[in-house]
UniProtKB/Swiss-Prot annotation:
GO terms for biological process: defense response. This is a cyclic peptide. Disulfide bonds join 4-20, 8-22, 13-27. It comes from Clitoria ternatea (Butterfly pea). It comes from the Eukaryota. Its main location: secreted. The keyword Cell division does not apply. Pfam families: Cyclotide (PF03784). Keywords: Disulfide bond, Knottin, Oxidation, Plant defense, Secreted. This is Cyclotide cter-O.
Length: 30
């Protein structure tokens, strides 16, 4: 539930390596 400061509208979350996932076009962690 914490925003990772990255959007994932066109590309996957680069912050995915830090545990972030795409939700509602924005990357979140927990």
């Amino acid at each position: 539930g914490i925003p990772c400061g990255e959007s994932c509208v066109f590309i996957p979350c680069i912050t995915g390596i830090a545990g972030c996932s795409c939700k509602s076009k924005v990357c979140y962690r927990n």
